[in-house]
């Protein structure tokens, strides 16, 4: 039975949800629309493991988990993972895949703001990957993530910088020329400059610890992490120990 989603939060964009609902059945197709997410997942996972000091037996929340690519990989590392998303179909795909692979984790259809009200300072690690640019109020998500993590805990964000280069790479290149992701996946106006993200972080108990770029070379078809944050980037933050 389909979960009721008629009561929506102010920070949910129905059109954004619909984009991912439409392609949810292909989330675990390694050659499909989500191939880039599968390709970069090891880089993201290793960054999270290194910067957090490991997640074995830690309580981890993946905000905007979609079909569960990152969430499932963190559960395989021994973490107690909860995946959070507002898309019904992606969560159904995530649950089914977890059953098929035998990976134990929990998926919840709920906004991060509501989850934060119910579970303050509950998690050791919170991840929010490629989600901020898909909501009306990304600062609200940052505040909720800060509320959810324990003192001394870690919060990781990833998003796309807002400039001409990122528009050319993430929209023109990835969507129209290389067809790496479906057309219309991104709205360049919603991209977020690092200074904006750090500004929101600074208004919470979170402290910026590290920032790194994620680069794609179309000639070698290779992804890597590096210092340049012109396009995709990740930010590691840590909640102040109280």
Curated annotation (Swiss-Prot):
Its EC number is 2.1.1.222, 2.1.1.64. It catalyses: a 3-demethylubiquinol + S-adenosyl-L-methionine = a ubiquinol + S-adenosyl-L-homocysteine + H(+); a 3-(all-trans-polyprenyl)benzene-1,2-diol + S-adenosyl-L-methionine = a 2-methoxy-6-(all-trans-polyprenyl)phenol + S-adenosyl-L-homocysteine + H(+). InterPro entries: SAM-dependent_MTases_sf (IPR029063), UbiG_MeTrfase (IPR010233). It comes from the Bacteria. Pathway: Cofactor biosynthesis; ubiquinone biosynthesis. CDD domains: AdoMet_MTases. It holds the Pfam family Methyltransf_23. Coiled coil: none annotated. S-adenosyl-L-methionine binds at residues 44, 64, 85, 129. One of its GO terms (biological process) is methylation. Keywords: Methyltransferase, S-adenosyl-L-methionine, Transferase, Ubiquinone biosynthesis. SUPFAM superfamilies: S-adenosyl-L-methionine-dependent methyltransferases. Belongs to the methyltransferase superfamily. UbiG/COQ3 family. O-methyltransferase that catalyzes the 2 O-methylation steps in the ubiquinone biosynthetic pathway. HAMAP family: UbiG. This is Ubiquinone biosynthesis O-methyltransferase. The gene is ubiG.
